[in-house]
Amino acid sequence: MRLRTGWAMGFVMLPVLAVGASAQISLSSAVDLALRNDPRVKMSEAAVQKAHAALSETRDVYVPNLTANGGYGQGFGVPTGLPTVFSLSSQSLVFNYSQRDNIRAAASGLAAANLALSEMREQVEEDVVVAYLNLDSDERCDATMTQEYSDATRLVAIVQDRLNAGQDTRMNLLRAQRTAKQIELDQLNLQDEIATLSDHLSRLMGLSADRLTAIENSIPELPSVHAAAENGSQSYSPGVRSAVASARSKQQLSFGLNRYRLRPQMSLGINYSRIDTGQNGYATYYPSFAGKSQNAVSVYLEMELPIYDRLHQHQADEAAAEASRAHFETEQQRNQFLDGRFKLKRSAAELDKRSDLAQIDQDIAQEQVKVVSAQLTAGNGSSGGEQMTPVDEQNAKLTESARTIDLLHAQFQLSQAKVNLLRQTGQLDDWLKAAMRISEGIPASNVSH
């Protein structure tokens, strides 16, 4: 039985089709699931909600509150206060020099949280893309190794036959057997890595630890190294800009604390109280109160002028030092980002050349297989030249497989560097949109098992 589950986020997502303990999934679907299920994104979203609530809190001090309280009991002796049955009171801030800075600080904090969320989303996207590309590369390497192992076992059989006919040596047989065993061991290690990558992707996407496989044609072509490094419009990553906004928030908070002393603060208050003297001797001690209204209403404007406050002064000094530290920390983070991007550009250019070199080596190995096969088909030509044997043909095929695996590894390393550059230059989202368009055009039959 085939189980189909589809996810959508404003568009039709390519479904994940599962059979037993394995499933194929497109790149765009993997990224979408990770963005909605990864705990790091959830934590960043919660931080944004907290920052939004903090901003609302700084503004709500101007909104009048409403409080009700009451109580009733028997009193004896001299009354110590008004016999209030219940009261309603409301109070709000009217003016405070520091509050404007507090609002600006909270707004900058919200901006920092949103940028941190963008940074975390990009990090999750990068993690998923790199893991997906690695999985796709390893799966192709596994297919190549399967053919390579078949060629190696064929070589062992040929050398064994030649040894039995007295045309080869036991040393060559042992070497052929060792080659086959080494390929078998390498393939087992590769399959372990594939299982690890599949489990890692499943965890990123919030799925069960099913065996995931990549869909090669769901991966759009990556741009050139030059385009990935130079075409972006983003000078700094969202993480760096988040640090800048956070430092600005701390600076505004420092301003607010420094504007506390010798500056007036005004608040508005309203109070209504219901008085009852029936259960105590209040009228006895204050006879003029008898027969008067038992309703009390007061409206007041309160002003406070802090003159001397060592606690707030030290808090202001602490905030100023923290703002200064955040500023220099931001400068350091900015420099580290620029240094890392410069090194990545140089590294990507080198990996590009290495990939070209691996492609040439693989082409040479392919041509060598053609030459040896042609000579064997033609009967080795003239008797004066070097005679080709089936052993030479199998060795040429093994060399071709090894060069193909080297090429796949070089191409993955280059692709990883390009993805890193796309993220740092702000182009990763555009590239993933291309992946989405590709996924929408893949027929369902292409993702079945």
What are these regions (language model features)?
Residues 1-33, 69, 191-232, 282, ...:
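Terminal intrinsically disordered/low-complexity segments used for targeting and assembly
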Residues 1-2, 25, 121-238, 347, ...:
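Periplasmic alpha-helical coiled-coil/stalk elements that build and connect Gram-negative outer-membrane
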Residues 29-95, 203, 207, 232-314, ...:
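A small-residue-enriched
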Residues 43-58, 120, 124-145, 154, ...:
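Amphipathic alpha-helical coiled-coil segments
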Residues 82, 101-109, 148:
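"Short basic amphipathic alpha-helical interaction patches in structured regions
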Residues 88, 97, 105, 110-112:
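A broadly used, surface-exposed interaction patch
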Residues 116-118:
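Hydrophobic alpha-helical hairpins/lids featuring a short glycine-rich hinge
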